[in-house]
Amino acid sequence: MTENWKFRRRTFLKHGAQAATLAGLSGLFPETLRRALAVEPDIRTGTIQDVQHVVILMQENRSFDHYFGHLNGVRGFNDPRALKRQDGKPVWYQNYKYEFSPYHWDTKVTSAQWVSSQNHEWSAFHAIWNQGRNDKWMAVQYPEAMGYFKRGDIPYYYALADAFTLCEAYHQSMMGPTNPNRLYHMSGRAAPSGDGKDVHIGNDMGDGTIGASGTVDWTTYPERLSAAGVDWRVYQEGGYRSSSLWYLYVDAYWKYRLQEQNNYDCNALAWFRNFKNAPRDSDLWQRAMLARGVDQLRKDVQENTLPQVSWIVAPYCYCEHPWWGPSFGEYYVTRVLEALTSNPEVWARTVFILNYDEGDGFYDHASAPVPPWKDGVGLSTVSTAGEIEVSSGLPIGLGHRVPLIAISPWSKGGKVSAEVFDHTSVLRFLERRFGVVEENISPWRRAVCGDLTSLFDFQGAGDTQVAPDLTNVPQSDARKEDAYWQQFYRPSPKYWSYEPKSLPGQEKGQRPTLAVPYQLHATLALDIAAGKLRLTLGNDGMSLPGNPQGHSAAVFQVQPREVGNPRFYTVTSYPVVQESGEELGRTLNDELDDLLDANGRYAFEVHGPNGFFREFHGNLHLAAQMARPEVSVTYQRNGNLQLNIRNLGRLPCSVTVTPNPAYTREGSRRYELEPNQAISEVWLLRSSQGWYDLSVTASNTEANYLRRLAGHVETGKPSRSDPLLDIAAT
């Protein structure tokens, strides 16, 4: 044993005292969180190799906004740069006969713990997404899909987010239901080959070639671990049992007791032929198919026999799939965390990943980043092979956002990450730790989605003094018992108004943020002679210091305000050699002719990761005889922003740059530019922690000329969440 991992009484008491101050009552601080926070990592190499155990629990069917849209410091209900509908309203407002917006499911007065599942099939998710507009939620779902929880409703999960690291850009792998997403989680794809054919888009898993419905047949990641000699195991309370209606009429208390042995068919390995047909005494069967639950997990932890990789499959009543409520999941996660922290020596070397397979059709405001799926809807510098479902011609994913919390001694501090991830990111993390490659992950997905390593401070320099705000957090087991009976005497959470006058907002307060590998650009050039709009997108993320991956790709979404359809562009931060021999990467150019109306007017936005935003308005036809300021930025290593403006037009102009007052006390700046004259001015961003929002207007220009630039300047170092998240969206 080394000094680094020791369960220090002084540290334990310090965290407990901090939490008691925040909560007002020390008894409200869950013992499992106090124990987990009090253990410091076992630092031997200062790298990912210090991780000896990875434990993964994938829960069911909850979206990010549904659970964490109200949490402070995340890109939730106050997102200042959410997509807009074509009528100019933000996508918080969803139309279908009436207008709907997110509404609170108050578990103190309603039976919000007990709601029906929404439509979450392939066709439903794609209809909601609507080619990127994300505006058809109410055309597909019931109003209940707009419901969300607050801290008082899911206190333990908010406490986990306050204590450890939450991902605000973790996406389900497919715009589809549970089983295909779990296939991605366990094997890197949902098809026997990587060409987009025979993709499993439903839950039956029958591929028509084996003759046994519910069986799939390709190599899984656990099989690759076995071949490499890496120890792994599945923990589950029992197998799958049909959820027929009979149990609805048995004794109320015993209803969920009966479901404690039912894994709801969520052990994805049971769908694969090699596992389903394995002899009962075989290694595959013994590792993946046996019933061994949290009690056995705790025993293995205490006896120091926990495998290197563990997948946990929750029982039906604790998996959080509607109608089973979040309090049941909180209880189960508490048990898992209690088991993992019962031996401080083991916990000091363990990473616990809590994620969700898909969002069930519950509302999330962020559009899904996807590859271009046909001509005219974007471009990519990296191959999109295997990412377009052949029979429909639609993108497979990514899907909408779902929660992921990284719980470990290396990920303390209530931080948030805006790096883009999906279920294959979990496999990529295992790749980095154990050196076993998952060959099924597509090139596009490897480029766009990170490997989770940025969530962890393996040097141990993280702030271990941070205690979470645990106000009003009761014991999770008592909440679970109370939640069960609510279904019998509380009304359902009915939608409150068909003409919402306000949006829900978020808790106040910023949150520490982790560095992300993006340094993005979007500039517009008006080609007067050819009558074209030319968009240039750039990604300099590879040049960022401290980038744990060294490279990444970013998905830009071009969102037209009135004319044209959304487009998606994938731009790598590194060169990629194409089949033609051409080298693409770092920048990408395209013409946006379909975004011009008959009079030459254009109005569109460009969205990217971590709140990256550009907005362009003007009139191409009128620009020929006018001043024509073109605007770009240079990111400085010290976190400041250099704004570059050049007048390429025929007339002089007066350019006004107006900052968002939420970021700075500085007023507008004005510049006089002759034709072909340029200026470069630095904007200091220290007071806004690197966030900026600048609007550029000018005289003697095309009608309604506007260039708006917003986002965050990355330096490779941690920062703070967007200050505008403290201000209600409008």
Swiss-Prot record:
Predicted to be exported by the Tat system. The position of the signal peptide cleavage has not been experimentally proven. Its EC number is 3.1.4.3. It catalyses: a 1,2-diacyl-sn-glycero-3-phosphocholine + H2O = phosphocholine + a 1,2-diacyl-sn-glycerol + H(+). Keywords: Cytolysis, Hemolysis, Hydrolase, Signal, Toxin, Virulence. Residues 1-38 form the signal peptide. GO terms for cellular component: extracellular space. It is an enzyme of class 3 (hydrolase). GO terms for biological process: hemolysis in another organism; lipid catabolic process; protein secretion by the type II secretion system. GO terms for molecular function: lipase activity; phosphatidylcholine phospholipase C activity; sphingomyelin synthase activity; toxin activity. Hydrolyzes sphingomyelin in addition to phosphatidylcholine. Belongs to the bacterial phospholipase C family. This is Hemolytic phospholipase C. It comes from Pseudomonas aeruginosa (strain ATCC 15692 / DSM 22644 / CIP 104116 / JCM 14847 / LMG 12228 / 1C / PRS 101 / PAO1). The gene is plcH.
